[in-house]
Protein backbone atom coordinates (compact mmCIF):
# COMPACT_ATOMS: atom_id res chain seq x y z
CA UNK A 1 0.00 0.00 0.00
CA UNK A 2 1.26 3.47 -0.91
CA UNK A 3 1.18 6.08 1.87
CA UNK A 4 2.65 9.54 1.33
CA UNK A 5 1.57 11.42 4.49
CA UNK A 6 1.83 10.60 8.17
CA UNK A 7 1.60 12.35 11.52
CA UNK A 8 3.80 11.04 14.32
CA UNK A 9 5.04 11.97 17.79
CA UNK A 10 8.69 11.87 18.79
CA UNK A 11 10.18 12.13 22.28
CA UNK A 12 13.91 12.39 22.87
CA UNK A 13 15.41 10.84 25.98
CA UNK A 14 15.72 12.74 29.24
CA UNK A 15 19.14 13.41 30.66
CA UNK A 16 20.16 11.26 33.60
CA UNK A 17 19.95 12.74 37.10
CA UNK A 18 23.10 13.89 38.82
CA UNK A 19 24.03 12.19 42.10
CA UNK A 20 24.69 13.43 45.61
CA UNK A 21 27.42 11.25 47.13
CA UNK A 22 30.42 11.68 49.41
CA UNK A 23 33.75 9.93 49.53
CA UNK A 24 33.94 7.71 52.58
CA UNK A 25 37.14 5.71 52.81
CA UNK A 26 39.45 4.67 55.58
CA UNK A 27 42.35 7.07 55.98
CA UNK A 28 40.62 9.68 53.80
CA UNK A 29 39.17 12.25 56.22
CA UNK A 30 36.82 14.85 54.79
CA UNK A 31 36.62 12.99 51.49
CA UNK A 32 34.31 15.57 49.99
CA UNK A 33 31.64 15.32 47.28
CA UNK A 34 31.84 12.35 44.92
CA UNK A 35 28.57 12.34 42.96
CA UNK A 36 28.86 12.13 39.17
CA UNK A 37 26.83 13.68 36.36
CA UNK A 38 23.95 12.00 34.57
CA UNK A 39 24.30 10.83 30.97
CA UNK A 40 22.86 12.55 27.91
CA UNK A 41 19.44 11.48 26.67
CA UNK A 42 19.18 9.91 23.23
CA UNK A 43 18.25 11.98 20.18
CA UNK A 44 15.57 10.95 17.69
CA UNK A 45 17.29 10.95 14.30
CA UNK A 46 15.72 10.53 10.86
CA UNK A 47 17.95 8.65 8.41
CA UNK A 48 17.21 8.49 4.66
CA UNK A 49 17.00 4.95 3.28
CA UNK A 50 16.83 4.73 -0.51
CA UNK A 51 15.25 1.28 -0.21
CA UNK A 52 12.02 2.69 1.22
CA UNK A 53 9.31 3.88 -1.17
CA UNK A 54 6.42 4.80 1.14
CA UNK A 55 5.57 6.08 4.63
CA UNK A 56 3.64 2.88 5.31
CA UNK A 57 5.88 2.07 8.29
CA UNK A 58 4.38 5.07 10.10
CA UNK A 59 0.76 4.03 9.67
CA UNK A 60 0.66 1.86 12.79
CA UNK A 61 3.86 2.93 14.52
CA UNK A 62 3.34 6.60 15.30
CA UNK A 63 5.20 7.07 18.58
CA UNK A 64 8.99 7.11 18.77
CA UNK A 65 10.75 7.52 22.11
CA UNK A 66 14.50 7.50 22.66
CA UNK A 67 16.09 6.12 25.83
CA UNK A 68 17.05 8.36 28.73
CA UNK A 69 20.60 8.75 30.00
CA UNK A 70 21.76 6.80 33.04
CA UNK A 71 21.98 8.48 36.42
CA UNK A 72 25.28 9.70 37.78
CA UNK A 73 27.14 7.35 40.13
CA UNK A 74 29.40 7.50 43.12
CA UNK A 75 33.18 7.90 42.78
CA UNK A 76 32.47 10.82 40.44
CA UNK A 77 31.45 8.48 37.62
CA UNK A 78 29.19 9.84 34.91
CA UNK A 79 26.11 7.98 33.78
CA UNK A 80 26.19 6.41 30.34
CA UNK A 81 24.71 8.49 27.54
CA UNK A 82 21.78 6.87 25.73
CA UNK A 83 21.98 5.62 22.16
CA UNK A 84 20.20 7.72 19.56
CA UNK A 85 16.95 6.35 18.17
CA UNK A 86 17.44 6.16 14.40
CA UNK A 87 14.25 6.14 12.32
CA UNK A 88 14.45 5.25 8.62
CA UNK A 89 12.51 7.41 6.14
CA UNK A 90 12.29 7.28 2.32
CA UNK A 91 14.06 9.71 0.02
CA UNK A 92 11.98 12.82 -0.63
CA UNK A 93 10.49 13.08 2.87
CA UNK A 94 9.62 16.59 4.02
CA UNK A 95 9.38 17.02 7.80
CA UNK A 96 7.21 19.74 9.32
CA UNK A 97 6.44 20.73 12.88
CA UNK A 98 2.75 19.82 13.13
CA UNK A 99 2.04 22.66 15.57
CA UNK A 100 3.66 25.54 13.67
CA UNK A 101 3.68 24.14 10.12
CA UNK A 102 7.35 25.13 9.81
CA UNK A 103 9.50 22.97 7.54
CA UNK A 104 12.24 21.39 9.65
CA UNK A 105 14.08 19.60 6.85
CA UNK A 106 13.77 18.14 3.37
CA UNK A 107 15.48 14.75 3.21
CA UNK A 108 16.52 13.84 -0.32
CA UNK A 109 20.00 12.25 -0.16
CA UNK A 110 20.61 8.60 0.72
CA UNK A 111 22.18 8.42 4.17
CA UNK A 112 21.22 12.00 5.04
CA UNK A 113 20.49 12.45 8.75
CA UNK A 114 18.58 15.03 10.74
CA UNK A 115 17.92 15.28 14.47
CA UNK A 116 14.18 15.90 14.87
CA UNK A 117 14.20 15.78 18.70
CA UNK A 118 17.22 16.48 20.87
CA UNK A 119 17.99 14.55 24.02
CA UNK A 120 18.33 16.40 27.31
CA UNK A 121 21.72 16.94 28.91
CA UNK A 122 22.56 15.07 32.07
CA UNK A 123 22.11 16.73 35.43
CA UNK A 124 25.23 17.69 37.37
CA UNK A 125 26.31 15.76 40.44
CA UNK A 126 27.32 17.42 43.70
CA UNK A 127 31.02 17.21 42.79
CA UNK A 128 30.27 20.07 40.38
CA UNK A 129 28.96 22.40 43.08
CA UNK A 130 31.87 22.27 45.52
CA UNK A 131 33.26 25.72 46.39
CA UNK A 132 35.63 27.00 49.09
CA UNK A 133 32.58 28.32 50.97
CA UNK A 134 30.63 25.07 50.56
CA UNK A 135 33.11 22.19 50.16
CA UNK A 136 30.48 19.50 50.80
CA UNK A 137 27.35 20.54 48.88
CA UNK A 138 24.22 18.42 48.96
CA UNK A 139 23.14 19.76 45.59
CA UNK A 140 22.48 17.90 42.37
CA UNK A 141 20.44 18.49 39.23
CA UNK A 142 17.80 16.38 37.58
CA UNK A 143 18.40 15.55 33.95
CA UNK A 144 17.06 17.96 31.35
CA UNK A 145 13.81 16.71 29.74
CA UNK A 146 14.20 15.55 26.15
CA UNK A 147 12.53 17.46 23.35
CA UNK A 148 9.03 16.31 22.48
CA UNK A 149 7.15 17.30 19.35
CA UNK A 150 4.51 16.23 16.85
CA UNK A 151 5.66 15.95 13.24
CA UNK A 152 3.88 15.96 9.88
CA UNK A 153 5.66 13.87 7.25
CA UNK A 154 5.08 14.26 3.52
CA UNK A 155 6.66 12.04 0.89
CA UNK A 156 7.34 13.71 -2.47
CA UNK A 157 8.90 11.18 -4.81
CA UNK A 158 12.11 12.06 -6.59
CA UNK A 159 11.54 12.31 -10.33
CA UNK A 160 13.00 14.46 -13.08
CA UNK A 161 9.89 14.38 -15.28
CA UNK A 162 6.21 14.29 -14.35
CA UNK A 163 3.37 13.01 -16.55
CA UNK A 164 0.13 14.95 -16.14
CA UNK A 165 -3.19 14.87 -17.94
CA UNK A 166 -6.81 13.79 -17.77
CA UNK A 167 -7.64 10.18 -16.86
CA UNK A 168 -7.29 7.64 -19.70
CA UNK A 169 -5.11 9.83 -21.93
CA UNK A 170 -2.38 7.16 -21.97
CA UNK A 171 0.01 8.22 -19.19
CA UNK A 172 0.42 4.73 -17.74
CA UNK A 173 0.75 3.18 -21.20
CA UNK A 174 3.47 5.68 -22.05
CA UNK A 175 5.33 4.95 -18.79
CA UNK A 176 5.13 1.20 -19.45
CA UNK A 177 6.73 1.48 -22.90
CA UNK A 178 9.49 3.99 -22.10
CA UNK A 179 10.52 2.36 -18.79
CA UNK A 180 10.48 -1.09 -17.23
CA UNK A 181 7.74 0.00 -14.80
CA UNK A 182 4.55 -2.07 -14.80
CA UNK A 183 1.72 0.32 -13.88
CA UNK A 184 -1.86 -0.90 -13.88
CA UNK A 185 -3.48 -0.13 -17.25
CA UNK A 186 -7.21 -0.25 -17.88
CA UNK A 187 -9.93 1.18 -20.12
CA UNK A 188 -11.56 3.12 -17.30
CA UNK A 189 -10.90 6.33 -15.41
CA UNK A 190 -8.55 6.46 -12.42
CA UNK A 191 -6.89 3.14 -13.15
CA UNK A 192 -3.82 4.79 -11.63
CA UNK A 193 -4.57 5.72 -8.02
CA UNK A 194 -0.99 6.01 -6.74
CA UNK A 195 2.11 7.52 -8.35
CA UNK A 196 4.30 5.19 -10.41
CA UNK A 197 7.99 5.74 -11.00
CA UNK A 198 10.23 4.47 -13.80
CA UNK A 199 13.70 5.08 -15.25
CA UNK A 200 14.13 6.08 -18.91
CA UNK A 201 17.29 5.45 -20.88
CA UNK A 202 17.51 7.23 -24.24
CA UNK A 203 19.25 5.94 -27.35
CA UNK A 204 22.10 8.37 -26.67
CA UNK A 205 22.65 6.85 -23.22
CA UNK A 206 21.10 9.57 -21.07
CA UNK A 207 18.77 8.54 -18.25
CA UNK A 208 16.15 10.23 -16.10
CA UNK A 209 13.32 9.34 -13.74
CA UNK A 210 9.68 9.71 -14.79
CA UNK A 211 6.65 9.82 -12.48
CA UNK A 212 3.15 8.90 -13.69
CA UNK A 213 0.55 10.65 -11.55
CA UNK A 214 -3.14 9.80 -11.14
CA UNK A 215 -5.32 11.65 -13.62
CA UNK A 216 -6.58 15.16 -12.96
CA UNK A 217 -10.01 16.42 -13.94
CA UNK A 218 -11.59 19.84 -14.00
CA UNK A 219 -12.25 20.98 -10.44
CA UNK A 220 -9.51 18.80 -8.95
CA UNK A 221 -8.21 21.76 -6.95
CA UNK A 222 -11.62 21.80 -5.20
CA UNK A 223 -11.40 18.08 -4.46
CA UNK A 224 -13.21 16.65 -7.50
CA UNK A 225 -12.03 13.17 -8.48
CA UNK A 226 -8.85 12.31 -6.61
CA UNK A 227 -8.28 16.01 -6.05
CA UNK A 228 -4.74 17.37 -6.13
CA UNK A 229 -3.47 15.15 -3.31
CA UNK A 230 -0.89 13.53 -5.57
CA UNK A 231 0.38 16.74 -7.14
CA UNK A 232 2.91 16.99 -4.30
CA UNK A 233 4.85 14.34 -6.22
CA UNK A 234 5.36 16.65 -9.18
CA UNK A 235 6.88 19.39 -7.02
CA UNK A 236 10.39 17.99 -7.36
CA UNK A 237 10.22 17.53 -11.14
CA UNK A 238 12.06 19.83 -13.52
CA UNK A 239 10.05 19.11 -16.68
CA UNK A 240 6.35 18.35 -17.16
CA UNK A 241 5.08 16.16 -19.99
CA UNK A 242 1.50 17.23 -20.60
CA UNK A 243 -0.26 14.21 -22.16
CA UNK A 244 -3.28 15.00 -24.34
CA UNK A 245 -5.60 12.53 -26.06
CA UNK A 246 -5.68 13.85 -29.64
CA UNK A 247 -8.25 11.24 -30.67
CA UNK A 248 -10.86 12.99 -28.48
CA UNK A 249 -12.21 9.51 -27.75
CA UNK A 250 -13.85 10.78 -24.56
CA UNK A 251 -15.77 13.44 -26.47
CA UNK A 252 -13.74 16.34 -25.07
CA UNK A 253 -11.89 19.03 -27.01
CA UNK A 254 -8.10 18.42 -26.70
CA UNK A 255 -7.37 22.14 -26.40
CA UNK A 256 -9.95 22.56 -23.64
CA UNK A 257 -8.29 19.62 -21.84
CA UNK A 258 -4.96 21.42 -22.12
CA UNK A 259 -6.35 24.63 -20.61
CA UNK A 260 -8.21 22.78 -17.84
CA UNK A 261 -5.16 20.85 -16.64
CA UNK A 262 -2.97 23.94 -16.65
CA UNK A 263 -5.61 25.74 -14.61
CA UNK A 264 -5.53 22.96 -12.01
CA UNK A 265 -1.73 23.05 -11.89
CA UNK A 266 -1.83 26.81 -11.37
CA UNK A 267 -4.49 26.47 -8.67
CA UNK A 268 -2.20 24.13 -6.77
CA UNK A 269 -0.07 27.24 -6.28
CA UNK A 270 3.37 25.71 -6.08
CA UNK A 271 5.00 27.43 -9.05
CA UNK A 272 4.27 24.41 -11.20
CA UNK A 273 3.61 26.60 -14.21
CA UNK A 274 7.20 27.86 -14.02
CA UNK A 275 8.42 24.42 -15.00
CA UNK A 276 8.93 23.91 -18.74
CA UNK A 277 6.21 21.85 -20.40
CA UNK A 278 6.31 19.57 -23.39
CA UNK A 279 2.94 18.88 -25.00
CA UNK A 280 2.62 15.20 -25.87
CA UNK A 281 -0.09 14.60 -28.50
CA UNK A 282 -0.91 10.97 -27.77
CA UNK A 283 -3.01 8.37 -29.63
CA UNK A 284 -1.97 9.63 -33.06
CA UNK A 285 -2.73 6.16 -34.44
CA UNK A 286 -6.45 6.82 -33.97
CA UNK A 287 -8.82 8.25 -36.62
CA UNK A 288 -9.23 12.05 -36.67
CA UNK A 289 -6.15 12.53 -34.44
CA UNK A 290 -4.21 14.39 -37.13
CA UNK A 291 -7.14 16.70 -37.82
CA UNK A 292 -7.55 17.38 -34.10
CA UNK A 293 -3.82 18.09 -33.79
CA UNK A 294 -3.95 20.73 -36.52
CA UNK A 295 -6.94 22.34 -34.83
CA UNK A 296 -5.08 22.22 -31.50
CA UNK A 297 -2.01 23.95 -32.97
CA UNK A 298 -4.20 26.65 -34.48
CA UNK A 299 -5.98 27.40 -31.18
CA UNK A 300 -2.68 27.35 -29.30
CA UNK A 301 -1.12 29.87 -31.67
CA UNK A 302 -4.12 32.19 -31.35
CA UNK A 303 -3.52 32.48 -27.61
CA UNK A 304 0.17 33.37 -27.94
CA UNK A 305 1.41 36.65 -29.37
CA UNK A 306 3.99 36.66 -32.14
CA UNK A 307 6.88 37.28 -29.72
CA UNK A 308 6.09 34.35 -27.40
CA UNK A 309 7.62 30.95 -27.99
CA UNK A 310 5.03 28.21 -28.42
CA UNK A 311 5.40 25.07 -26.30
CA UNK A 312 6.94 22.13 -28.13
CA UNK A 313 4.41 19.57 -29.39
CA UNK A 314 5.41 15.95 -30.02
CA UNK A 315 2.88 13.66 -31.74
CA UNK A 316 3.26 10.07 -30.49
CA UNK A 317 1.42 6.81 -30.07
CA UNK A 318 2.06 4.92 -26.86
CA UNK A 319 0.46 1.86 -28.41
CA UNK A 320 2.56 1.70 -31.61
CA UNK A 321 5.60 3.51 -30.07
CA UNK A 322 5.49 6.10 -32.86
CA UNK A 323 7.58 9.21 -32.09
CA UNK A 324 8.86 8.03 -28.69
CA UNK A 325 12.58 8.26 -29.44
CA UNK A 326 12.26 11.88 -30.59
CA UNK A 327 10.20 12.77 -27.51
CA UNK A 328 12.67 11.21 -25.08
CA UNK A 329 15.69 12.87 -26.72
CA UNK A 330 13.97 16.27 -26.54
CA UNK A 331 13.04 15.67 -22.90
CA UNK A 332 16.63 14.76 -21.99
CA UNK A 333 17.92 17.86 -23.78
CA UNK A 334 15.43 20.09 -21.92
CA UNK A 335 16.40 18.51 -18.60
CA UNK A 336 20.05 19.38 -19.21
CA UNK A 337 19.10 23.05 -19.58
CA UNK A 338 16.67 23.20 -16.66
CA UNK A 339 17.97 23.79 -13.11
CA UNK A 340 16.36 22.25 -10.06
CA UNK A 341 13.51 24.17 -8.45
CA UNK A 342 13.95 24.87 -4.75
CA UNK A 343 10.89 23.79 -2.80
CA UNK A 344 11.85 25.58 0.39
CA UNK A 345 14.03 28.50 1.29
CA UNK A 346 16.80 27.02 3.43
CA UNK A 347 16.86 30.18 5.54
CA UNK A 348 13.30 29.38 6.64
CA UNK A 349 14.19 25.88 7.78
CA UNK A 350 15.02 25.09 11.37
CA UNK A 351 18.72 25.09 12.05
CA UNK A 352 20.32 22.25 13.98
CA UNK A 353 19.19 22.83 17.54
CA UNK A 354 21.56 24.36 20.02
CA UNK A 355 21.61 24.37 23.77
CA UNK A 356 21.15 27.53 25.78
CA UNK A 357 18.81 30.47 25.65
CA UNK A 358 18.42 33.41 23.34
CA UNK A 359 19.33 36.69 24.95
CA UNK A 360 16.03 38.16 23.80
CA UNK A 361 14.02 35.21 25.08
CA UNK A 362 11.60 36.19 27.83
CA UNK A 363 12.80 34.36 30.93
CA UNK A 364 9.40 34.04 32.61
CA UNK A 365 5.77 35.12 32.52
CA UNK A 366 3.37 35.81 35.37
CA UNK A 367 -0.38 35.22 35.31
CA UNK A 368 -3.08 34.67 37.91
CA UNK A 369 -5.58 31.83 38.20
CA UNK A 370 -9.23 32.15 39.17
CA UNK A 371 -8.32 30.99 42.69
CA UNK A 372 -5.95 34.00 43.04
CA UNK A 373 -2.83 31.83 42.77
CA UNK A 374 0.10 33.42 40.97
CA UNK A 375 1.32 31.22 38.10
CA UNK A 376 4.88 31.35 36.79
CA UNK A 377 5.71 29.99 33.32
CA UNK A 378 8.26 30.39 30.56
CA UNK A 379 10.69 28.10 28.77
CA UNK A 380 13.80 29.18 30.68
CA UNK A 381 12.09 29.08 34.05
CA UNK A 382 10.54 25.66 33.38
CA UNK A 383 13.91 24.26 32.34
CA UNK A 384 15.45 25.36 35.64
CA UNK A 385 12.42 23.99 37.51
CA UNK A 386 12.54 20.60 35.82
CA UNK A 387 16.25 20.23 36.54
CA UNK A 388 15.90 21.08 40.24
CA UNK A 389 16.09 18.17 42.69
CA UNK A 390 13.37 19.06 45.20
CA UNK A 391 14.38 16.17 47.45
CA UNK A 392 17.43 18.18 48.52
CA UNK A 393 17.00 21.34 50.57
CA UNK A 394 20.16 22.90 49.15
CA UNK A 395 18.88 22.35 45.61
CA UNK A 396 15.61 24.06 46.53
CA UNK A 397 17.51 27.00 48.02
CA UNK A 398 19.63 27.20 44.86
CA UNK A 399 16.45 27.33 42.74
CA UNK A 400 15.08 30.12 44.94
CA UNK A 401 18.29 32.11 44.40
CA UNK A 402 17.99 31.56 40.65
CA UNK A 403 14.43 32.89 40.67
CA UNK A 404 15.54 35.92 42.63
CA UNK A 405 18.41 36.50 40.21
CA UNK A 406 15.99 36.35 37.27
CA UNK A 407 13.90 39.09 38.88
CA UNK A 408 10.89 36.92 39.71
CA UNK A 409 10.54 38.27 43.27
CA UNK A 410 10.58 41.90 42.10
CA UNK A 411 8.13 41.15 39.29
CA UNK A 412 5.68 39.48 41.69
CA UNK A 413 5.85 42.46 44.05
CA UNK A 414 5.24 44.81 41.12
CA UNK A 415 2.15 42.79 40.18
CA UNK A 416 0.80 43.12 43.73
CA UNK A 417 1.85 39.83 45.35
CA UNK A 418 1.70 39.91 49.15
CA UNK A 419 3.36 37.88 51.87
CA UNK A 420 1.67 34.46 52.08
CA UNK A 421 0.22 34.44 48.55
CA UNK A 422 0.38 31.10 46.76
CA UNK A 423 2.71 30.81 43.75
CA UNK A 424 2.52 27.85 41.35
CA UNK A 425 5.11 26.49 38.95
CA UNK A 426 3.77 23.47 37.11
CA UNK A 427 2.22 21.33 39.87
CA UNK A 428 4.52 22.73 42.56
CA UNK A 429 3.12 25.38 44.93
CA UNK A 430 4.86 27.53 47.52
CA UNK A 431 4.16 30.66 49.55
CA UNK A 432 5.51 34.02 48.52
CA UNK A 433 7.67 35.57 51.24
CA UNK A 434 8.10 39.32 51.00
UniProtKB/Swiss-Prot annotation:
Where do the OCT domain residues begin and end?
Answer: 356-434
Entry binding sites for Mg(2+): 172, 192
Q: Which PROSITE patterns match?
A: G_OBG (PS51710), GTP1_OBG (PS00905), OBG (PS51883), OCT (PS51881)
What EC identifiers does the entry list?
A: 3.6.5.-
Show the GO cellular component annotation of the record: cytoplasm
Query: Which of this chain's residues are annotated to bind GTP?
Result: 165-172, 190-194, 212-215, 282-285, 317-319
GO:BP terms for this protein? ribosome biogenesis
Single annotated GO MF: GTPase activity
Q: Where is the OBG-type G domain?
A: 159-336
Group of enzyme by EC: hydrolase
* InterPro entries associated with the record: G_OBG (IPR031167), GTP-bd (IPR006073), GTP-bd_Obg/CgtA (IPR014100), GTP-bd_prot_GTP1/OBG_C_sf (IPR036346), GTP1-OBG_CS (IPR006074), GTP1_OBG_dom (IPR006169), GTP1_OBG_dom_sf (IPR036726), OBG_GTPase (IPR045086)
Predominant cellular place of this UniProt entry's protein: cytoplasm
* UniProt-listed CDD domains: Obg (cd01898)
Q: Which Pfam families match?
A: DUF1967, GTP1_OBG, MMR_HSR1
Q: Which UniProt keywords apply?
A: Cytoplasm, GTP-binding, Hydrolase, Magnesium, Metal-binding, Nucleotide-binding
Name the cofactor(s) required for activity, per the record. Mg(2+)
Summarize the protein's role.
An essential GTPase which binds GTP, GDP and possibly (p)ppGpp with moderate affinity, with high nucleotide exchange rates and a fairly low GTP hydrolysis rate. Plays a role in control of the cell cycle, stress response, ribosome biogenesis and in those bacteria that undergo differentiation, in morphogenesis control.
Which family is this sequence assigned to?
Belongs to the TRAFAC class OBG-HflX-like GTPase superfamily. OBG GTPase family.
Family matches, as NCBIfam families = Obg_CgtA (TIGR02729), Obg_CgtA_exten (TIGR03595), PRK12296.1 (NF008954), PRK12297.1 (NF008955), PRK12299.1 (NF008956), small_GTP (TIGR00231)
Complex and partners: Monomer.
The name on file for this protein is: GTPase Obg
Organism, scientific name: Streptococcus pneumoniae serotype 4 (strain ATCC BAA-334 / TIGR4)
Amino acid sequence: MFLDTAKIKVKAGNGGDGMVAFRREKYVPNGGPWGGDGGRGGNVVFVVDEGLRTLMDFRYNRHFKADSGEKGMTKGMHGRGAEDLRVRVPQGTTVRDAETGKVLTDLIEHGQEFIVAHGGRGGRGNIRFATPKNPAPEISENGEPGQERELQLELKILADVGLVGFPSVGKSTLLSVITSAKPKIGAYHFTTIVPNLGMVRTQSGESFAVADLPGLIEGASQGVGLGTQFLRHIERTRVILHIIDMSASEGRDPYEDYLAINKELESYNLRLMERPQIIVANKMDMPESQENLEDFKKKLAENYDEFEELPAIFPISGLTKQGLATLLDATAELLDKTPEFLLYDESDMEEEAYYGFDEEEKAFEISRDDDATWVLSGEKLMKLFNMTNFDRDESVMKFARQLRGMGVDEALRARGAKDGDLVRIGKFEFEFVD
